[in-house]
């Protein structure tokens, strides 16, 4: 089973764009290959330097394990996933104390989407942290990673530094499994070794010449009344290959082989990068069967590409196209970032947008994409703040311009079916 790892790469920040050398008028849209180092945004360097590595090995709990108590952090704007990198930044005294308590006592925390959805939350492990005092204000910055889905039985409080800290009581690790192919139920287990079908996923983007012909792969279908096209649709390798085919264009030159090859981890990863509303992601997170989750992900992707439209969430005017989505981070075309006000945004990056208005001068402070400066974007029809324009004048970086839209304010158009 191949697990994703979080790598910290050495970075020279001296090449960042300064105000004195920035000339917005000299910037033009750049098409073609992306040359930007897309590992930089995934490292969340804007959180600052001098992070301390959290001690401890990878957290792993058996299914149905009970955690008697664990600190809670509410984040109502974003649904988090196992395997996802999670940035946290706090300046308010209560939140700072909650994060310090989680760091010092547990090295883990429970991230809750909303009070109504405590039935399924995420256990996150602290990878590194920074506690500092800047201009008289205490800040706590954390880099964490999602580990397990968890069900919270109840929420109570405990006292830390004269502050009430929310605690999850009797949190139960939820089971994740992969349901069997329908044909597996009519095949003798002793025949598994001579029938293919368990490793036909085209992770590399090239055809697998070692797989058996489909007619042999579905040999047992001769003994059922189930049409072959239905069995083909339900086949796990076909399902994953269809999903990879829909998402491959988002990556440009970034190898998609970075995606996890364990089926359950892959289902978490591909669901996390979908540019859809939080309630739809929550419904996907509630699913225990990875096969079912992947089927629903594929259905959403097919509808997204059918309508091929990203609209303002307030007035529904056309803002962009699904075809224009690109990955400016090694984590994928979407990502979770936090601003100086501790507000979390899940964004999707595009190479072009329409019906937008820019405001302000480009700023480089707290930039989520090192070497880029940002400007505010608003819907030209209703004035709704929808995201940011990122620009660079460095000639060795492509693209010179791209756009990040917050999924709180825009939505990919799909039909009204809810998953």
Language model regions located:
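A short Gly-Trp-Pro
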Residues: 305-419
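N-terminal low-complexity, acidic/polar interaction/targeting segments
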Residues: 2-311, 318
